[in-house]
Amino acid sequence: MAIQIFKVGLKDHSVLDPVLKRAREDLSSTLALVKPIVEDVKNRGDSALREYTQKFDEVIPPKSFVLEISKLNPKIDPKLKTALVKAAKNIRNFHKIQIPENKEIIIHGNKLGILHTPIESVSVYAPGGKALYPSTILMGVIPAKLAGVKNIQIVTPPRKGTLPDGLIAAAKIAGADRIVMAGGAQGIAAVSYGTESIPSSEFVVGPGNKFVTAAKVYLSGQGVIGIDSPAGPSEVLIIADDSADPMWVAADLLSQAEHGEDSVAILCTNSLSLAQKVKEEVEKALIERPKRGEMKRKSIKDHGKIFVFSNLEECFVFSNLFAPEHLEIQTKNFKKDLKKVKHAGSVFLGNYSPVAMGDYISGTNHILPTAGAARIYSSLGVSTFLKRVTWQEVSKKSIQNLYPHVKVLSEFEGLDEEHGNSVRIRR
């Protein structure tokens, strides 16, 4: 069985609710496994990290977990280097427009302002597993550099005790300072607490499996690090009408299924004809493009859906409830339809904007909130690595004019003896 078609309305809760709840899994069981690993790395440092690296990554741990990028000279295919440089340039140019201005305003004669200051040290997690992700290194490091972060390290699992030159090249092009060859919960713990050989970071970003996510959530809850949004399985929701190309829509669904067996791929449409054609194209593509076929088939079977609503308005209502990581809008009036979007990690407009463009080269960030977190989180960006510091310079005249209000408020809160007095003595 491939992808299923459902004719639905917004009140069909038995069909829609399980999809809306998708990967909001209870992390408690994973946290129970992760906590002792994290605490062990905290207490025993490199020694514990070596044991877990050999156990979970099934490699002989490297002699040194840390690679200083300035000392490395990776050898990669010129075409790969050109692509990485181009992607980095586009990412940098897009994220430059996110750099906020420090601002001032005068209120009642007082100067008030906002000062943006960077986090001092950041680790960017680049997943291991079934694929290599030099693009994630670019996506994590470049916004941090633009924000002014001075100390940036990559944390990623070793492959056969070392790292591919492609990952090292990406780190060098992006401007990272070092690479920490450690993955999973143990790697997150190492860069959070620091070890004998690994510097600690104040903030950790980047996608990973449920153990990485659980470690980030646990350490954040302990106040050890700050994190970006907790990551779940990759997902795409496509809203399309009969102007969309069914083969292209099918390809975009399968590009998400290619990430993993738990990836989510959903089409919402008002056209039963398009739905049927997309289903046929998905089945055809699974035969014609067999690479990672078992993974794609399981993803599509378990987490792939085609919903046929009576109109596009219902498609957008459902999408905003779902709050997808990636939202594609392949409709006749896609620019107008963008205004209907309330919750999404990143939006891809028109027939010529597949998610893969944002994954690699267009310049938007691919580190995005998943599992409905787009309702409250944004994509990774420059602001992720900045703190907003407010300041004020109060005049003597303002003290005199505003003290009566301070007196009333401090008395109401029962704090006039010291709060009120600190203003009163300055009149």
Swiss-Prot record:
Binding annotation for substrate: 234, 256, 259, 326, 359, 413, 419
Pathway involvement of the protein, from the record: Amino-acid biosynthesis; L-histidine biosynthesis; L-histidine from 5-phospho-alpha-D-ribose 1-diphosphate: step 9/9
Catalytic residues identified in the record: 325 (proton acceptor), 326 (proton acceptor)
Enzyme class label: oxidoreductase
EC numbers: 1.1.1.23
GO molecular function: histidinol dehydrogenase activity; NAD binding; zinc ion binding
Name of one Pfam family that matches: Histidinol_dh
Binding-site positions, NAD(+): 125, 186, 209
PROSITE patterns: HISOL_DEHYDROGENASE
Gene Ontology biological process terms from the UniProt entry: L-histidine biosynthetic process
Binding site for Zn(2+): 256, 259, 359, 419
The entry's keywords: Amino-acid biosynthesis, Histidine biosynthesis, Metal-binding, NAD, Oxidoreductase, Zinc
Cofactor(s) the protein requires to work: Zn(2+)
Catalysis performed (reactions): L-histidinol + 2 NAD(+) + H2O = L-histidine + 2 NADH + 3 H(+)
InterPro entries referenced in this protein's UniProt entry, alphabetically: Ald_DH/histidinol_DH, Histidinol_DH_CS, Histidinol_DH_monofunct, Hstdl_DH
Gene Ontology CC annotation, any one: cytoplasm
Cofactor note (record): Binds 1 zinc ion per subunit.
Function: Catalyzes the sequential NAD-dependent oxidations of L-histidinol to L-histidinaldehyde and then to L-histidine.
Protein family: Belongs to the histidinol dehydrogenase family.
Name used for this protein in its record: Histidinol dehydrogenase
Protein's organism: Leptospira interrogans serogroup Icterohaemorrhagiae serovar Lai (strain 56601)
Top-level taxonomy: Bacteria, Pseudomonadati, Spirochaetota, Spirochaetia, Leptospirales
Gene that this sequence comes from: hisD
